[in-house]
UniProtKB/Swiss-Prot annotation:
Residues 1-26 are annotated as: Disordered. CDD domains: MATE_eukaryotic (cd13132). Belongs to the multi antimicrobial extrusion (MATE) (TC 2.A.66.1) family. The modification Phosphotyrosine is found at residue 25. This is Uncharacterized transporter C323.07c. GO terms for molecular function: antiporter activity; transmembrane transporter activity; xenobiotic transmembrane transporter activity. The lineage of its organism: Eukaryota, Fungi, Dikarya, Ascomycota, Taphrinomycotina.
Length: 533
C-alpha cells in the first residue's frame, strides 16, 4: 500500500526509459523518417526538409527519390504511395495495435450482451426495459463521457509521439476532472428517469422498470468513466495488451454475477441484479488498471497529481466539446431508434434491443481498429511524420473495408439462429429475422464510419466530425426516415434503412475531408499545442 500511494501522489516523475512509439524502426530509419518531414526529435525543432526521403535498405534508391515529393491535398493515392514495404509496415502496425484491442472490445461488449441475454429470458417487458436503459445510459452519460475521453485520442497520442510522456499524465488528470463534474447532472437525470419516460409516452410498465434500473446504475457511471479514461491513457502510449488481460477476467466475472444476482434461487434478486452486476464489473476493471499503472514492471511515466492539471484547460475543453458533439450526436441518432421502436409496440422494441446489441457486438471489431488507427496517426503526427500519417490513414480505410465486409457476411449467414440466443418469443424472432439482411449492410457502412471518425480524432478534427454527424444524421437521414416510416408504414425496416443512409453520407464526407487534409498543417498545429501544455 505504501508503494501504491507513493507512486499515485508522487511529485517527481517516474524513472525509467520511455518506450518510443516507433521503436520498431532502427535508429537510422527513425532519423531519416524524421528528416523527411522536417522534424528532428533530438532538437525538438522544425526544419524545412532538404534531403531525399529514404527508408534505409527497405526501398530501392529510385523509389527513395520519388518519395521526397511533398504530398499536397487532392493527389491520388497512387502518387503518394511510399512503396510496398512501407505500406506493409503500416498495415502490420495497425494489426499489431488492433488485434489485442479487438479481443478487449469484444469482451467488453459481451458485458452488455450477457445483460440483454439474461433479462431477455425474464420476459419481453424486461427486455424492452433493458433496451431503454441501455439507450438512456448511452445518450445521457456514456456518449458524453466518451466525447470527453476522445480528447485523449488527439492530445495524449500526439504528446506521446513527441516524446512528452508526462504531458500525457496531465491530460489524463484534466480529463478525469471534467468527467467528475459531468457525473452530477447525469445522476440527477437518472434519479428522475421514470417520470421523464412517461412524459415521452413510453409504456408505463417499461418506464417503471427502466427507472428502477437506472437508479441502481448510478453506481456504475463513475466506474465506467474511470475505466475508459485509463484505458485510453494506456492506449495513447501504445499499451494495449494489459487492457485485454483485465477484460479477460472481467467478462467472465460479469457473466457469473449476472447469474448469481439475477437467476440464483438464494442470493439472486431478479431484474435489479443486472445493474448491480454491471456496476461491480466496471469498478473491478477500473481498480485493475489502477493497480497495473502503479505496479507494472513497464515504466509508465506518472508525475503524481499536479496543480498543472487545473491550468490551461482550454485545449482539453475544446477537444472535449467537439468530441462530445461528434459522439453524442452519433450515439443519440443510433439510440433514438429504440425510442422510435417504442412507438411501434413492445415486440418491435424488444426486437430492436436484440438488433442493437448484435450491431454493437460486431461493431467492436472495426472500432478496435479505429482506435488503433487514431493512436498510430497521433503518434506519427506527434513525432513529425506527416507523410506517413497520411499513408496510414489510407491503409486504415482499406483494412476497415475488409473487416466490415467480413462482419456483414457473418451476421447474414447466421440470421436464422441468432435471435434465438436472446429470446424464445416467436413474434420477436420473426421481426429480427426479417431485419437481418438490412442489418448486414448497415454493419459494413458503420465499420467504415467508425474508422473515419477515429482518423478525424487522431488528427484533431473532432469539430468537423461533429458537423458531419449532425448533417448526416439529423439534417438528412432523420427527415427521410420519419417520412418513410410514417407515410409508408415500413416499421423497423424503414428505421434501419435510414441508419444506412446516415452512415453512407457520413462516410462520404469523412473521406472527402481526410483525402484533402493538409497533413503538414496538422503537424504544425500539434506542435503548437505541445508547447502550451
Amino acid at each position: 500500500m505504501k508503494r501504491f500511494f507513493s507512486k499515485l501522489f508522487s511529485k517527481s516523475p517516474t524513472s525509467g526509459r520511455v518506450p518510443s512509439p516507433d521503436s520498431d524502426y532502427s535508429e537510422e530509419e527513425q532519423r531519416l523518417l524524421a528528416e523527411e518531414n522536417g522534424y528532428f526529435q533530438d532538437s525538438n525543432e522544425y526544419v524545412e526538409p532538404n534531403i531525399p526521403a529514404v527508408y534505409g535498405s527497405m526501398i530501392p534508391v529510385a523509389q527513395q527519390l520519388q518519395q521526397h515529393h511533398v504530398h499536397t491535398p487532392g493527389e491520388s493515392f497512387a502518387d503518394n504511395a511510399s512503396g510496398y514495404p512501407v505500406i506493409k509496415h503500416e498495415l502490420s502496425e495497425l494489426l499489431r495495435l488492433g488485434s489485442p484491442t479487438v479481443i478487449a472490445y469484444l469482451l467488453q461488449s459481451s458485458e452488455q450482451f450477457s445483460t440483454v441475454f439474461t433479462l431477455g429470458h425474464l420476459g419481453k417487458e424486461y427486455l424492452a426495459a433493458s433496451s431503454l436503459s441501455t439507450m438512456t445510459a448511452a445518450i445521457s452519460a456514456f456518449s458524453i463521457f466518451q466525447g470527453v475521453i476522445s480528447s485523449l485520442d488527439t492530445l495524449a497520442t500526439q504528446a506521446f509521439g513527441a516524446n512528452k510522456p508526462y504531458n500525457v499524465a496531465i491530460y489524463l488528470q484534466r480529463c478525469l476532472l471534467i468527467l467528475a463534474v459531468l457525473h452530477i447532472p447525469v445522476a440527477l437525470i437518472w434519479l428522475n428517469l421514470e417520470h421523464i419516460l412517461i412524459f415521452l409516452h413510453q409504456d408505463p410498465m417499461v418506464a417503471h422498470l427502466c427507472g428502477r434500473y437506472m437508479r441502481v446504475f448510478i453506481l456504475a457511471a463513475p466506474g465506467y468513466a474511470v475505466f475508459e479514461a485509463l484505458k485510453r491513457y494506456l492506449q495513447a502510449q501504445g499499451i494495449f495488451t494489459p487492457i485485454t488481460y483485465v477484460l479477460c477476467f472481467a467478462a467472465p466475472l460479469n457473466i457469473l454475477l449476472n447469474y448469481l444476482l439475477v437467476w440464483h434461487p438464494t442470493i439472486g434478486f431478479g431484474f435489479l441484479g443486472a445493474p448491480v452486476a454491471v456496476a461491480t464489473t466496471f469498478w473491478f476493471q477500473s481498480i485493475c488498471l489502477i493497480l497495473y499503472i502503479c505496479f507494472s514492471s513497464t515504466p509508465i511515466p506518472w508525475p503524481g497529481f499536479s496543480r498543472q492539471a487545473l491550468k490551461n484547460l482550454s485545449p482539453m475543453l475544446h477537444f472535449s466539446f467537439h468530441g462530445m458533439l461528434m459522439i453524442v450526436t452519433e450515439w443519440a441518432a443510433y439510440e433514438m431508434t429504440s425510442l422510435g421502436a417504442g412507438y411501434l409496440g413492445t415486440a418491435p422494441l424488444a426486437s430492436q434491443s436484440i438488433l442493437l446489441t448484435s450491431t454493437s457486438l460486431l461493431f467492436q471489431i472495426p472500432f478496435a481498429f479505429a482506435v488503433a488507427s487514431s493512436t498510430r496517426v497521433g503518434h506519427l503526427i506527434g513525432s513529425g511524420r506527416a507523410n506517413l500519417a497520411r499513408l496510414c490513414s489510407r491503409v486504415a480505410y482499406s483494412l476497415a473495408l475488409c473487416i466490415s465486409i467480413f462482419d456483414g457476411s457473418l451476421i447474414f449467414c447466421f440470421r436464422d439462429v441468432w435471435g434465438s440466443l436472446f429470446t424464445s418469443d416467436p413474434e420477436v424472432l420473426a421481426v429480427v429475422k426479417d431485419i437481418f439482411p438490412i442489418l448486414s449492410l448497415f454493419i459494413v457502412t458503420d465499420g467504415l464510419n467508425a474508422v473515419g471518425g477515429g482518423l478525424l480524432r487522431g488528427t484533431g478534427k473532432q469539430y468537423i466530425g461533429g458537423l458531419i454527424s449532425i448533417g448526416s444524421s439529423y439534417l438528412f437521414a432523420l427527415p427521410v426516415t420519419v417520412f418513410v416510416v410514417v407515410y409508408f408504414n415500413t416499421g423497423l425496416k424503414g428505421i434501419w434503412c435510414g441508419m444506412i443512409l446516415s452512415s453512407v453520407t457520413a462516410i462520404t464526407c469523412q473521406f472527402t475531408v481526410l483525402f484533402n487534409t493538409d497533413w503538414h498543417r496538422v503537424l504544425q498545429e500539434a506542435r503548437h499545442r505541445l508547447t502550451h501544455v
